[in-house]
Amino acid sequence: MPGDTVTALRELPIEPLTPEAFAAFGTVIPPTDNGVPLGTGDARLDLSQGTPRFYVMRIPGRGFTVTRITRHCKVTQVLASAGGKSWVMGVAPPRAIDDPSTEPDIEEIRAFAIPGDVAVMLHKGTWHIGPLFPEGTQESFFNLELFDTNKVDHQTCDLSARYGLALKLVTA
């Protein structure tokens, strides 16, 4: 991690994804049969702050040691593997989404193994790391956000600069 000032490496266990474990961060969207009516477990999207953008993003694998975490405060974001492969995501609960100086509580960061046949919707302001998968690979992901999310609604906390910390997401 060139340029980073990491003084500590903290292991973060990767947990199995369940709707209950993920509830503070967003909604797990499992496969459902076609024609099933809207239910209480369905994701409630908020795309009201702009024009929605749905696209397939190609991401190089960076491995599982990370120093940055990001959030989007104006939109819910939906992510899913386009190839049906499992992946990993780190998350921290949203806090004070109207305050751009707010940073994540590093003690609340958790990591989840996301099965390839589900999507996740992140609450507005949920801090996230990933999608992550092994270094040297490349994967495609479905992404639903706003057309300008990455330009006007992209707050990143550099864990190495702020806390001297890198997180290594490890199998529990």
Predicted regions and their residues:
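Non-catalytic, conserved peripheral segments adjacent to functional cores
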Residues: 1-107, 111, 149-172
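Generic detection of intrinsically disordered/low-complexity segments and helix-coil linkers/edges
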Residues: 16-19, 121, 127, 135-136
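A short pocket-lining beta-strand/turn micro-motif at the edge of beta-sheets
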Residues: 85-87, 110, 118, 137-140
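Conserved metal-binding segment of the jelly-roll/cupin
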Residues: 113-131
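A short beta-strand-loop micro-motif that forms or neighbors metal/cofactor-
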Residues: 126-158
